[in-house]
Amino acid sequence: MTASATSTEGQEAASTSGFWGLTLGSIGVVFGDIGTSPLYAFREAAHGAAHGEPVSRMIVLGVLSLILWSLFIVVTAKYVLLLLRADNNGEGGTLSLMALGQRALGRRSMFLMSLGVIGASMFIGDSMITPAISVLSAVEGLKLAAPALEHYVVPLTVFILVVLFAVQSKGTARVATAFGPVMVLWFASLAVMGIVHITDDPSVLAAINPYYAVQFLLSHGTIGLVTLGAVFLAVTGGEALYADLGHFGRKPIQSAWLFFVLPSLLINYFGQGALVLSDPAAIENSFYRMVPELLLLPLVVLATAATVIASQAVITGAYSLVSQAVQLGLLPRFEVRYTSESHAGQIYLPRVNRLLLIGVMLLVLLFRTSSNLASAYGIAVSTTMVADGIMGFVVIWKLWNLRAAVAAAIIVPFVIVDLSFFSANLLKLFEGAWVPLLFGAAMAVTIWTWRRGSAILVLKTRKIEVPLDDLIGSLEKRPPHIVKGTAVFLTSDPTSVPTALLHNLKHNKVLHEHNVILTIETAQTPRVDVSERVRMEKISEKFSKVRLRFGFMESPNVPRALAVARKLGWQFDIMSTSFFVSRRSLKPSSQSGMPSWQDHLFIALSRSANDATDYFQIPTGRVVEVGTQVTI
């Protein structure tokens, strides 16, 4: 055997092991939410269909058929086979899809921006419900194992969730390696439990025929629509497949879903159906009734571990989404802490963590059971799925270069299905669906206020700013005292004089040897190639313009990026460089163009924003802050 042949075989083996490693990782992270749905989805759907009456055979077959075809259409066809191909430089998710759509159109679209904001806001609302309903439904198994422990279900759930949120600041890199094996054990258990009961009554497999789904909806009227809202619980988490695209890649996610996760879920749902056909009373908790009493406690422990992993994935997703929103200018700069030196994506946002914890605690204490929480679950996810579908149309039409009619033929059937689920979930508005809508609306108002206030602030400051070329010309005619070193002035408008530069000249009456007007931009792509990171333009002997570009999923590190400028001829030395940053103190104005409440909200958001020094990772010892007062 030649050396080249040996090398090729080694590369193929490494590639294969890498693929299976990513597949295992995706099982542990991507499918946690949808993978824990069997705990409550079939039970809630059958309960809703029976409407207080005994569960009949036609109800069981109808519900199973609806679940099966919902998983086929919404998750498999729409997300796994279609939208996973709509990646933004390898990344997925609502905001990535929004940015991809903007890029496809070649301009900023307020419609796409609104869809992206709505989808992202509803994801945050869903991020509060998923941990609450998942962990609560798992711990409820204790009521069957030991009825005397029923009063401890809520306190134990609260304890588990508090611990989960408390350890976020420590990072999850160490324990994340166990997520894959635990979830593999979970899905394997789902399949085994289902097989045992399906063999008792194989006739339940008749529900594979879509006739039972259609017949159920046609014959049950409004109750059928209510049931559809409960059936949707089986597909919640499907949007996470797309959001985690950048972490694992399309093929590992597709393989894990098609060959392991989907079969395990379907087998378990059909097993629950077979159990209820033989024992209608089992519908009270059809999942835990699938195992003998001896295995009940181990199953509760495994289910709790699976729901904690599912919750962790959702929490991490919320951090990532908010971080992207900050980079895209949709939210103020939140404090971001990096919990792993080797994984840049391992981040922790203290404020987001606190808000999620408060929301989750309120949900658990107010609703107290997973059945009650099920009424609140679904509306946020269905809203996000509708938004994804519409934005997906733009990408298929403009980026994939298909005719509008062809793109519509592909995506409209999915949007119709999504709208059907959205309508069904709206029926639960007063039973609890208002909760995620309230959370999502609060998030959307926050984003809208920040965008609107920031735009007004830019317009007001531009009116009083001095053109940079005019100042340079004036300084050349009457030069001030020159001091050694480099001054870097951060600004959003490179054509105007940064406020910090004006204040430095006014109060200190000095100018540095080298002055850099630094602008930081966020691209519509997740990451920016190093070769495109820095653009430098020398505009006079003492002044240069530098533009730094970062992707919306990157952590902006200004000193590291400026080091790249050495290749462009700038001998950057951090120890001889001072960074001048403006800190604005905002005051409300009756002429701002916004309502008074929005003025005050924008000012509060601005005050809560993290320091530019920390956010851009500039050494504090090299920073000079200049305060200015602005009336908006």
UniProtKB/Swiss-Prot annotation:
> What keywords tag this UniProt record?
Cell inner membrane, Cell membrane, Ion transport, Membrane, Potassium, Potassium transport, Symport, Transmembrane, Transmembrane helix, Transport
- Which GO molecular function, any one, fits this protein according to its record? symporter activity
Which GO cellular component terms are attached? Answer: plasma membrane
Q: Which InterPro entries match?
A: K+_transporter (IPR003855), K_trans_C (IPR053952), K_trans_N (IPR053951), Kup (IPR023051)
Q: Which reaction does it catalyse?
A: K(+)(in) + H(+)(in) = K(+)(out) + H(+)(out)
Membrane-spanning intervals of the chain: 19-39, 58-78, 110-130, 147-167, 178-198, 216-236, 257-277, 290-310, 347-367, 377-397, 404-424, 429-449
Q: Where in the cell is it found?
A: Cell inner membrane
Report the family membership: Belongs to the HAK/KUP transporter (TC 2.A.72) family.
- Tell me what this protein is called: Probable potassium transport system protein Kup 2
Q: Which organism is it from?
A: Bradyrhizobium sp. (strain BTAi1 / ATCC BAA-1182)
